[in-house]
Amino acid sequence: MIKKLSKLVKDFTLSELRTGMKITAKELVNKKITVQFPEERTPISPRFRGLHALRRYPNGEERCIACKLCEAVCPANAITIESEMRDDGTRRTIVYDIDLFKCIFCGFCEEACPVDAIVETQIFDYAFKSRQGSIMTKERLLEVGSQNEQAINQARLEDAKYK
C-alpha cells in the first residue's frame, strides 16, 4: 500500500520530469562537444585501421612477395591473391584484391605481412558508386600507398613506441 502511495505521489509531482529538465538545463550551459565533421576533424589515433594500401620500396619495386600469409590469416576471406614466378626466381602478385564489403578491418593482414607490404592507412572517408567499387585492386592499393607514403610512415613512427 505504501509503495502504491509513494508511486502516486511521484507521478503526481512529476519528479522524473523535473529530474530530466534539471539535467537538460545543466547541460545547456556546458561547452558543446559536437564536431562539425566535414570542416572540422577530430584527431585520429596512429593505430587507426582504415583503407588498405600496398607499399613500395624506395627504388619503386613493390614490397609484396606473394607469400599469401595475409590471405590465409584474413578471418573474413576478403583478400584474393594470385601470383607468378618471375625470371629471376622471385614470386610476385598478379592479382591482389581486397573486398571492402567483406573486410572487418581487424589488421591481421598487416600483422602477418613479413615485409610490411600491406598496411591500413588512416583514411576513413571513402565511398563507392557501385558494388564493384568496393573491391580494391592491386593497382588501386599501390596508388593509395604511393599517395600516402609519408602519412603511413609518420603513423608507423608514432605507433612504434607502443609496440
UniProtKB/Swiss-Prot annotation:
Domain 4Fe-4S ferredoxin-type: 54-84, 94-123
A GO term, aspect molecular function: 4 iron, 4 sulfur cluster binding
Annotated binding of [4Fe-4S] cluster 2, by residue: 74, 103, 106, 109
Record-annotated disulphide pairs: none
Catalytic activity reported: a quinone + NADH + 5 H(+)(in) = a quinol + NAD(+) + 4 H(+)(out)
Cofactor: [4Fe-4S] cluster
InterPro entries per UniProt: 4Fe4S_Fe-S-bd (IPR017896), 4Fe4S_Fe_S_CS (IPR017900), NADH_quinone_OxRdtase_chainI (IPR010226)
Keyword Mitochondrion in record: no
Highest taxon of source: Bacteria
Subcellular location: Cell inner membrane
Keywords tagged on the record: 4Fe-4S, Cell inner membrane, Cell membrane, Iron, Iron-sulfur, Membrane, Metal-binding, NAD, Quinone, Repeat, Translocase, Ubiquinone
Protein's UniProt keywords contain Transmembrane: no
Main EC class the enzyme belongs to: translocase
Purpose of the protein: NDH-1 shuttles electrons from NADH, via FMN and iron-sulfur (Fe-S) centers, to quinones in the respiratory chain. The immediate electron acceptor for the enzyme in this species is believed to be ubiquinone. Couples the redox reaction to proton translocation (for every two electrons transferred, four hydrogen ions are translocated across the cytoplasmic membrane), and thus conserves the redox energy in a proton gradient.
Oligomer and partners: NDH-1 is composed of 14 different subunits. Subunits NuoA, H, J, K, L, M, N constitute the membrane sector of the complex.
Family: Belongs to the complex I 23 kDa subunit family.
Protein name as annotated: NADH-quinone oxidoreductase subunit I
Gene: nuoI
